[in-house]
């Protein structure tokens, strides 16, 4: 059992980033192996780690166990029995308590429970005059009130999905950076992730970069290095599965490494709406505002869900103003350009436009290949470039689709006991490839582009050359090459029998201009999203 765990840990250390390995794998320990039942029990130091490792790494550990023992092994994750003897992470205050008088009163244990009442009329201890006794009693009463406030704040936070604040933090609002404090022990690190809602797996190290996202990544790194100074707010937009969420988690994780005392919160817009509703129902807007206005970094995902929700927009506007005024960083994502989000107040749109807005485009061929190769490597599988290119050529929309296709290929290969080849890949992705080919056709592209630029579909085949017709025709040719499997001669034939060199010229022209013309790039992005449904 121990030999296996050494082998498993060594492999995972090579596959994961140092941060991931130290945070999630190193604290684990094998505690039991039942050879008769083929079960392996692995202990985690706390519930948070247990749940995360179970959801993120159980599959890989099970695969390694099967390979090691040459038999299917059921891996069970259990809580370390010693975990209950330690104080919960949340009981450790993250900011210093208010100082007490120099007299030495009996200590009051910190914790979420309400502190015991203090009897102000109790006799003074021997050797202590009345004035000193009164000071001690006052200090104890203040500390009891402080503990009660923390408990009440924690209850309200649980209702509103607001990570609890210590009483000192609740009173002081913002706090200063305290580098190194969060790394004091494993529980403190877990507590940071619980409060921030960050996914520690999503980092800059494992973010695959290409032309489609290099500007967004550069801006994200700049913001992580200079929060509240460079590009505030940072607004990232693009279709689903293109890496927006990965990138904003990477910013949060980097800032947490650099400044462990930072108050960071990632939240999906729908959860923010839910918090506003609960605060309204419970008349708890003071707690709501105190929490959101005191952050150092707010990461809000899919803000288009604010559409039509006026009260949510109003509260977010006040939070935005408070954060920016305090030089806190705000990062927002959406599926579309800010001005095109319907149902959002104009004053919010103007705030979004006041920082830096960056699009993340669908990954180009080389980037899709790199994503597949890296993902396969992380799964411990050797994927040939031929197979990666085949998949990347046929699946073009987003990263999630690529990763889903790869999982399907790996499962198909394992189930049938066959090597991963192009033939096996075609079999594994048969349904997916059929759907892709059925969804986007050259005819559909011609109609969509014609409607977008308000010309006739017949103009796509005609010999007319006015700019208002020739330009959309070139765009349609470019999209036909990008989104279908048609060859240049086949595309030319479908555009009124044009020569393949004409199509090649159009494709190169639009591809070149796309990188220089923001308006054209935006139009192409809209057309691609429309065609992909």
From Swiss-Prot:
It is found in: Cytoplasm. GO terms for biological process: DNA replication initiation; regulation of DNA replication. Residues 1-72 are annotated as: Domain I, interacts with DnaA modulators. Residues 96-110 have a biased composition (Pro residues). ATP binds at residues 241, 243-245. Residues 197-413 are annotated as: Domain III, AAA+ region. GO terms for cellular component: cytoplasm; plasma membrane. Its main location: cytoplasm. Keywords: ATP-binding, Cytoplasm, DNA replication, DNA-binding, Lipid-binding, Nucleotide-binding. Residues 83-113 are annotated as: Disordered. Domain I is involved in oligomerization and binding regulators, domain II is flexibile and of varying length in different bacteria, domain III forms the AAA+ region, while domain IV binds dsDNA. Belongs to the DnaA family. This is Chromosomal replication initiator protein DnaA. It comes from Burkholderia mallei (strain SAVP1). The lineage of its organism: Bacteria, Pseudomonadati, Pseudomonadota, Betaproteobacteria, Burkholderiales. The gene is dnaA.
């Amino acid at each position: 059992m121990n030999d296996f765990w050494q082998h498993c840990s060594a492999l995972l250390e090579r596959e994961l980033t140092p941060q991931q390995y130290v945070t999630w794998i190193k604290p684990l320990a094998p505690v039991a192996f039942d050879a008769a039942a083929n079960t392996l029990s692995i202990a985690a130091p706390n519930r948070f780690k247990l749940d995360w490792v179970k959801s993120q790494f159980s599959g890989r550990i099970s695969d390694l166990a099967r390979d090691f023992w040459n038999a299917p092994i059921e891996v069970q994750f259990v809580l370390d029995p010693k975990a209950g003897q330690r104080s919960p992470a949340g009981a450790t205050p993250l900011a210093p308590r208010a100082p007490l008088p120099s007299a030495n009163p009996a200590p009051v244990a910190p914790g979420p429970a309400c502190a015991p009442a203090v009897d102000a009329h109790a006799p003074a201890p021997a050797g202590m005059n009345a004035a000193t006794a009164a000071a001690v009693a006052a200090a104890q009463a203040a500390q009891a009130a402080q503990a009660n406030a923390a408990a009440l704040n924690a209850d309200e936070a649980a209702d509103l999905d607001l990570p609890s604040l210590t009483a000192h933090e609740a009173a002081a609002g913002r706090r200063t950076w305290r580098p190194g404090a969060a790394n004091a022990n494993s529980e403190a690190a877990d507590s940071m992730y619980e409060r921030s809602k960050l996914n520690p797996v999503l980092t800059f190290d494992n973010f695959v970069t290409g032309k489609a996202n290099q500007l967004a990544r550069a801006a994200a790194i700049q913001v992580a290095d200079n929060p509240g100074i460079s590009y505030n707010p940072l607004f990232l937009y693009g279709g689903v599965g293109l890496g927006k969420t990965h990138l904003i988690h990477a910013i949060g994780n980097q800032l947490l490494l650099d400044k462990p005392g930072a108050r960071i919160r990632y939240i999906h817009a729908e959860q923010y709406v839910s918090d506003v509703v609960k605060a309204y129902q419970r008349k708890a807007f003071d707690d709501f505002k105190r929490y959101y206005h005191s952050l150092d970094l707010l990461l809000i995902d899919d803000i288009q869900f604010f559409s039509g929700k006026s009260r949510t927009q109003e509260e977010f506007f006040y939070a935005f103003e408070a954060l920016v005024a305090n030089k806190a960083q705000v990062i927002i994502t959406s599926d579309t350009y800010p001005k095109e989000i319907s149902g959002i107040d104009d004053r919010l749109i103007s705030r979004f436009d006041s920082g830096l807005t960056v699009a993340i485009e669908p990954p180009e061929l080389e980037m899709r290949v790199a994503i597949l190769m890296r993902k396969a490597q992380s799964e411990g599988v050797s994927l040939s470039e031929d197979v990666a290119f085949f998949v990347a050529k046929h699946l073009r929309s987003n990263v999630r689709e690529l990763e889903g296709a790869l999982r399907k290929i790996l499962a198909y290969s394992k189930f049938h006991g066959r090597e991963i080849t192009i033939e096996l890949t075609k079999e594994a992705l048969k349904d997916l490839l059929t759907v892709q080919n059925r969804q986007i056709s050259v005819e559909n592209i011609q109609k969509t582009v014609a409607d977008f630029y308000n010309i006739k579909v017949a103009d796509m085949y005609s010999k007319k050359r006015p700019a208002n017709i020739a330009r959309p025709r070139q765009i349609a040719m470019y999209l036909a090459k990008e989104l279908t499997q048609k060859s240049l001669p086949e595309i030319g034939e479908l555009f009124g029998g044009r020569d393949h060199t004409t199509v090649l010229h159009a494709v190169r022209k639009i591809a070149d201009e796309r990188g220089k013309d923001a308006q054209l790039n935006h139009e192409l992005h809209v057309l691609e999203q429309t065609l992909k449904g």
